[in-house]
Amino acid sequence: MPTSAAVQTDDSLASPFDWPGRPHAAPGFARLGERFLTRLPPVPMPAAPYLVGFSPEAAAPLGLSRAGLDTPAGLDVFVGNAIAAWSDPLATVYSGHQFGVWAGQLGDGRALLLAELQTADGPCEVQLKGAGLTPYSRMGDGRAVLRSSIREFLCSEAMAGLGIPTTRALCVIGADAPVRRETIETAAVVTRLAPSFVRFGHFEHFAANEKLPELRALADFVIDRFYPACRAEPQPYLALLREVGRRTAALIAQWQAVGFCHGVMNTDNMSILGLTLDYGPFGFLDGFDANHICNHSDTGGRYAYAQQPQIAYWNLFCLAQALLPLCGSDPTAFTDLSDEAQAQPAIDAAQEALLVYRDTYGEAFYARYRAKLGLTQAHDGDEALFGDLFKLLHTQRADYTLFFRHLADVRRDDTPAQAQARTVRDVFFDRDSADAWLAAYRQRLQTEPAPDAARAEAMRRVNPKYVLRNHLAEIAIRRAGEKDFSEVENLRAVLARPFDDHPGFEHYAGPAPDWAASLEVSCSS
């Protein structure tokens, strides 16, 4: 693996920073070569760095402690002021569709991949987001701001706590350097971790530029590293497409089940590993609105909550188009897409491979919601029960998280007085309509074999008490702006175990206050 000297003109950025037991660094994506990336150093911060947030859960596989990172040498490496000997910083090139329109070449415009570390859990890429200009920055300045970095840090770890596949966030480091957005904001760098940051857009880039050897090399890299079972298939690239479709479907079902809205599901923000990637204008549902748009920049509602399953399929279709040259009858040869006799079989095969998304999503969606309702068996009337529930929640804008959390308290043999006293009714303004659905739900529970207590316990393991509501993130951001990082840490710790009770932090579980309705998040991070 090339050392950091390969990207420096002098030794001014060299750092001895290391920690005992650091996993071995080895070439991963970097082995693909210069057609896929550009090696360059980070741009040093013009102000002193300070630690804003640290995730011990994300750091555990790396063997890195907060005390080990929070040193002058450690802060310098993870803010981009210095390059450790185990690091080989680089930015990758990709393209993509943004809001349904081909955007051409994109790439890591403010992110640098520092290294791939071989942990006991497998490969772990370490990436700085906000590390300065790269050849792919386009009109950007290469920086990230404290506001968006805290949001990404907290949500990455919150999603991990929920058991949803995601990139992780090791730390956030701030620096009192001005960054111009809609206003002047404070600079920050978030360190992200993932087995790989390869996106759908990486494949689109080489397909669009007709660089077919590079397209094959990228697909082979992903298969050999992350989908080795595909190599044994007669059509390994079609097998890859199917497996990515399966993982993506499972991921989106998990998003929908917890009320997570990504906000900007462009193809360049879709992980080839089925991870939640790029936390920008995201949000969790407060009052349930199937058409909720969390991204203020999404004026057409393309990425609204209810649209996410279809958008994920659309993005997979773009990935399939990119892989078509590899999907012909002979996987060792490139398919000539200008020749209908070659192209049509590849198209048909890719379309068939994508069917796995529809089937997997449907199965995963209903399995998730049966679990949320405490139902262990599938019944013919369940879809109608679910549909009536979604209509009820949507019509009354009932708090999504609180409803499912309180639903565990319902008992199948509640007396009328007990039914009237259940807290779950409090999330509705029209309680008569809620009572009608709850009566149907109690009737459905009569067919379940599990006792009420066991069912309630199981429901509390899948229905979180805590999610990262926008107003909670906003409070943490405002306090961090005053150099009080305690709210970032408290929120991180609670969200790492969102299904548990946390005495002293019950206010994190409450509904959004009225002032939160004015909060807006957009792509301007």
UniProtKB/Swiss-Prot annotation:
UniProt-annotated binding residues for Mg(2+): 269, 278
Pfam families: SelO
Positions bound to ATP: 107, 109-110, 129, 141-142, 192, 199, 278
Molecular function, one GO term: ATP binding
Cofactor: Mg(2+); Mn(2+)
Parts forming coiled coils: none
Superkingdom field: Bacteria
Family: Belongs to the SELO family.
HAMAP family the record matches: YdiU_SelO
Annotated protein name in UniProt: Protein nucleotidyltransferase YdiU
